[in-house]
Swiss-Prot record:
Pfam families: Adenylsucc_synt. This is Adenylosuccinate synthetase. Mg(2+) binds at D18, G45. HAMAP family: Adenylosucc_synth (MF_00011). GO terms for molecular function: adenylosuccinate synthase activity; GTP binding; magnesium ion binding. It comes from Bordetella parapertussis (strain 12822 / ATCC BAA-587 / NCTC 13253). InterPro entries: Adenylosuccin_syn_GTP-bd, Adenylosuccin_syn_Lys_AS, Adenylosuccinate_synth_dom1, Adenylosuccinate_synth_dom2, Adenylosuccinate_synth_dom3, Adenylosuccinate_synthetase, P-loop_NTPase. Disulfide bonds: none annotated. Pathway: Purine metabolism; AMP biosynthesis via de novo pathway; AMP from IMP: step 1/2. It is found in: Cytoplasm. Belongs to the adenylosuccinate synthetase family. One of its GO terms (biological process) is IMP metabolic process. Its main location: cytoplasm.
Length: 435
């Protein structure tokens, strides 16, 4: 039974990822004692700008930038030991204390070399029909988890069990690689030797994360649950099959961190003031003209992990409405408002025409979304700069009107507005922890 009152917040991307979650988690981390990753892997990067210096985190929660904050990698994450240790070394080289403040769930599924081999071979075989995976083994690792053949972090410390499980799973994957995908097999000895070499460095950070989070809640500590990707990439609720391999909605924080759902009191939905998407998949409000190019250029829309250019389009309020419902969004944070500065007019998606009928929420499935024609509403733009503004009243009148219309279309209040990449370039209307 929880003895003291804590407040816990889930931060969720409401679009197709890349909404600016890293900056907001970093900013909110000043109000918490723990930050938790609960799904995904090292396929998505969170970009932070601290005092003008760029930092990209792929696995480690963004709270690591704050002294006194403990960071947790929950059981819902698929973990590449090699990628994690490399990221730790990069942060330590920058002067951060990481290992004493990072805990890794002992029951995380491992990403191993054969997952990467399968991922890359599949994409190569699909050619133009590819989904656009990052090729880091995320999907195949989740497949092993669901098929109950995965190796987990705790297996690294039982070599005999590791060998037994590896032989079984590699027999399966090598058959797929050689007989179906036409690729080279993966050596069991190489996989084992690499994993065993990395295990000692990982061992001091391995914990029962679920139990430790429960203790923090009993002590009244505030926790922040950091989502990766975005709700429209959710394996169930996204534009399937152009989705990621995990559940990235707010409800996944409970299962992916091992906490009860009653512990999640507030859900902050992060959304850009426009819309972007990486890779393949339908995108109703996409702009393939000079305005789309302008948004990409000013917004620096390139993937933080892959470097791939992002497709850009107008804000899609009907897609966001789907995310609001899926996640139980308490309040929105609008990021990159400044990218819209200087546009004479701005379009805002309010729904779709599907087979001649108006729909005010994103349909399910890629085929249905591909047939949806965006219904756009035109609003006046603004010429004044919004960069670095920290008071809502100082925003241009038309910028405020735009934000108010976004909130109206989506049916949820705006609590935060980001006007630049630095953590201090933030307008606070209601603080998720203090409001």
């Amino acid at each position: 039974m929880i003895r003291k009152m804590s407040k816990n917040v889930v931060v969720i991307g409401t679009q197709w990822g890349d909404e600016g979650k890293g900056k907001i988690v970093d900013w909110l981390a000043e109000s918490v004692q723990g930050v938790v990753r609960f799904q995904g892997g090292h396929n998505a990067g969170h970009t932070l700008w601290i005092n003008g210096k760029k930092t990209i985190l792929r696995l480690i929660p963004s709270g690591i930038m704050h002294d006194g904050v403990t960071c947790f990698i929950g059981n819902g994450v698929v973990l590449s030991p090699e990628a994690l240790l490399r990221e730790i070394e990069e942060l330590e080289a920058a002067g951060l204390d990481v290992r004493s403040r990072l805990q890794v769930s002992e029951i995380c599924t491992l990403i191993l070399p054969y997952h990467v081999a399968v991922d890359k071979a599949r994409e190569a075989r699909k050619g133009e029909g590819k989904i656009g995976t990052t090729g880091r083994g995320i999907g195949p690792a989740y497949e092993d988890k669901v098929a109950r053949r995965a190796l987990r972090v705790q297996d690294l410390f039982n070599p005999a069990l590791f060998d037994e499980k590896l032989a079984e799973v590699l027999d399966y994957h090598n058959f797929v690689l050689t007989q179906y995908l036409g690729a080279e097999p993966v050596s069991a000895n190489e996989v084992r030797d690499q994993a065993m070499a990395l295990a000692p460095a990982l061992a001091p950070m391995v914990r029962d994360v679920s139990s430790n989070l429960f203790v923090l809640q009993q002590e009244g500590k505030n926790l922040l649950f950091e989502g990766a990707q975005g709700a429209l990439l959710d394996v169930d609720h996204g534009t399937y099959p152009f989705v990621t391999s995990s559940n990235c909605v707010a409800g996944a924080a409970s299962a992916g961190a091992g906490v009860g759902p009653q512990a999640l009191q507030y859900v902050l939905g992060i959304t850009k003031a426009y819309t972007t998407r990486v890779g393949s998949g339908p995108f109703p409000t996409e702009l393939v003209d000079e305005i789309g190019t302008r948004l990409a250029t000013i917004g620096k829309e390139f993937g933080s992990v892959t470097g791939r250019p992002r497709r850009c389009g107008w804000f899609d309020g009907a897609a966001l409405k789907r995310s609001v419902r899926l996640n139980g969004i308490s309040g929105l944070c609008i990021t990159k408002l400044d990218v819209l500065d200087g546009l004479e007019t701005i379009q805002l998606g309010v729904g779709y025409r599907v087979n001649g009928e108006f729909r005010d929420v994103l349909p399910y499935g890629a085929h249905a979304v591909a047939q949806a024609q965006a219904v756009l509403e035109e609003l006046p733009g603004w010429t004044e700069s919004t960069v670095g503004i920290t008071e809502y009243s100082k925003l241009p009148v038309n910028a405020r009107r735009y934000l108010e219309r976004v909130a109206e279309v989506c049916g949820v209040p705006i609590d935060l507005v980001s006007t630049g990449p630095d953590r201090n370039e933030t307008i606070v209307l209601r603080h998720p922890f203090k409001g």
